[in-house]
Amino acid sequence: MSLQGPVSVDLLAKEIPAVRDLAYFGLMQTRLYGRDVMISRTGYTGERGYEIFCRGKDATHLWDSILGAGKDMGVRPVQFSTLDMLRIESYLLFYPGDNSETFPFDDEPCGDTLWEL
């Protein structure tokens, strides 16, 4: 599951203080709400975020625990299209869905060219 946004580190740090020092693209194996997890400091939203990998049998417990602990911080579930909008706003493009499959300067003389999104 993915925990993205400006309060993600504060929420996780309540249970795992060392998460504050996790480098971008870093991984750590630890325990979260009493369950074994692997946490990566990754995401595709342009915000600080984490992805939490767990056993299937632990997913519901972790989901409920994260939402409960984060309720007063504004943490709430969102659908994938919300994450997709953040990704596009941060110019993290998904090829070829967000841009052309052709190079915009093919067969064009030097000069003003508008990039497409």
Where are these regions (language model features)?
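Conserved, structured C-terminal
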Residues: M1-L117
